Design a protein with these regions (language model features):
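C-terminal motif of bacterial Sec signal peptides marking the signal peptidase cleavage site
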Residues: 21-24
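Sec-dependent N-terminal signal peptides
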Residues: 10-18
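Processing junctions and N-termini across compartments
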Residues: 19, 84-87, 103-106, 125
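Bacterial signal peptide processing site
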Residues: 26-28
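Short cysteine/histidine-rich metal-coordination sites, predominantly Zn2+-binding motifs
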Residues: 104-112, 123-135
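Bacterial N-terminal signal peptides that target proteins for export
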Residues: 2-11
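Iron-sulfur (Fe-S) cluster-binding segments and ferredoxin-like electron-carrier domains
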Residues: 96-103, 114-123
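N-terminal pre-ligand scaffold of iron-sulfur
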Residues: 31-102, 135-159
Length: 159
């Protein structure tokens, strides 16, 4: 009789422990907020999603953590309304780890001082071998800017 009561107690306890452990799991479709002090970017399994409403003509910086590295990038709306995104690291000056700052309608390299019109960034380096905000491919879909985590991770060497 004691064995049956113990077995029932064990089964019930296991059931409740399972409920507690698995109730916090999200499905692959669910989006969870990645709340850091810089952004309200959201993350899914393979991509980062930034609400378009969050991107203005004032540059906003975002961080992505991987392999003990912080990959930093920024998003800004150009004067023509197009969204521009780039790594916060230059193709040449990245070893200095100084990134960019916004000065009016330009992004300025904090290392060498070169200025880049916001409307022109978000592409591959136009001056091969020179300073340029690192290219980060993005997709705009619905109300979100989407960034592949794989594209972020491919450029972790800059950071």
């Amino acid at each position: 009789m004691k064995k049956i009561i113990m077995l029932k107690s064990l089964i019930i306890t296991s059931f409740f422990i399972s409920l507690v452990l698995f109730s916090g799991c999200n499905s692959a479709e669910e989006v969870s907020a990645n709340t850091d002090s810089k952004s309200s970017a959201q993350t899914q399994i393979n991509q980062i999603m930034i609400p378009l409403s969050e991107i203005t003509e004032k540059a906003k910086w975002y961080d992505y953590e991987v392999d003990n590295k912080t990959i930093s990038y920024f998003a800004v709306k150009a004067s023509d309304g197009r969204i521009k995104v780039a790594f916060d690291a230059c193709d040449v000056c990245y070893p200095e780890k100084k990134g960019y700052r916004q000065l009016g309608s330009d992004m300025v390299c904090n290392n060498c001082g070169l200025k880049f019109a916001i409307g022109g960034i978000g592409t591959e380096n136009k001056a091969s071998g020179g300073c340029w905000p690192g290219y980060l491919p993005v997709i705009i879909e619905g109300d979100y800017l989407k960034i592949s985590k794989q594209n972020l991770e491919k450029s972790k060497w800059r950071f």
